[in-house]
Amino acid sequence: MSTTCAIVPAAGRGLRMGRDRPKQFLEIAGRSILLHTLDALAAAPFLAQTYLLVPEDFQDEARGLVCGHPSVTVVAGGAERQDSVLNGLRSLPDECGWVLIHDGVRPFVSSALLEAAWKTAQRTGAAIAAVPATDTVKRGQGGTVVETLNREEIWLVQTPQVFRRDIIASAYEAAVQRGWVGTDDASFVERLNLPVSVVLGERTNVKVTTPEDLDWAQWFLLRSGGLAGRISGRE
């Protein structure tokens, strides 16, 4: 029987955070962002193993951090996010037939969303979490508006993104061979003209990228009394 493995890309340097260490190792309420994320993934009973991609020079620190998560394997990441995910895909055991990819700096994902994306992918082969755009979206060029896009058709993409292994592996190998560049995993699947299902995401499933995001994360944890009471269900 095939199992589901998670790939957690967390090898970025976090330059937009303006700190002297990668953002995933910064703390929220005395615990690193990365550990909050791994705690959330650990609440998903269908995940057999997690592969954590970190900067090569932070592997020892990461192994120390995850000692309480025996199902987590630390792997050296690459220069870009897609390089890290590719390293993760190439590290998976043969029995892993499904792959869940989740950003290491999205610590507030609920187990309900993880399960919804996983169950949808089981039916369709590929599924992503996303939320509808609420702001007006315009396309610009050279500081001038070119057009206003139809907001009803715009989705703001998150992770988790879940795929049948052969689909996402083929998509990433095609990206290597053809020089494709993408900021999310589903974009490579789309370029193979394969369908990708959308699951309604969560507004609180924030990617902690900027100092303002970090402030919001601290506030959110304080307001919610920590993660333990909320990762089992959506808000």
UniProtKB/Swiss-Prot annotation:
PROSITE patterns in the record: ISPD
Keyword Transferase: yes
Main enzyme class: transferase
Single Gene Ontology MF annotation: 2-C-methyl-D-erythritol 4-phosphate cytidylyltransferase activity
Catalyzed reaction equations: 2-C-methyl-D-erythritol 4-phosphate + CTP + H(+) = 4-CDP-2-C-methyl-D-erythritol + diphosphate
Keyword Transferase: yes
Alphabetic keyword roster: Isoprene biosynthesis, Nucleotidyltransferase, Transferase
InterPro entries named among the record's database cross-references: IspD (IPR001228), IspD/TarI (IPR034683), IspD/TarI_cytidylyltransf_bact (IPR050088), ISPD_synthase_CS (IPR018294), Nucleotide-diphossugar_trans (IPR029044)
Entry's Gene Ontology BP terms: isopentenyl diphosphate biosynthetic process, methylerythritol 4-phosphate pathway
Cited Pfam families: IspD (PF01128)
Family from the record: Belongs to the IspD/TarI cytidylyltransferase family. IspD subfamily.
Function: Catalyzes the formation of 4-diphosphocytidyl-2-C-methyl-D-erythritol from CTP and 2-C-methyl-D-erythritol 4-phosphate (MEP).
Name of the protein in its database record: 2-C-methyl-D-erythritol 4-phosphate cytidylyltransferase
Organism: Syntrophobacter fumaroxidans (strain DSM 10017 / MPOB)
Gene from which the chain derives: ispD
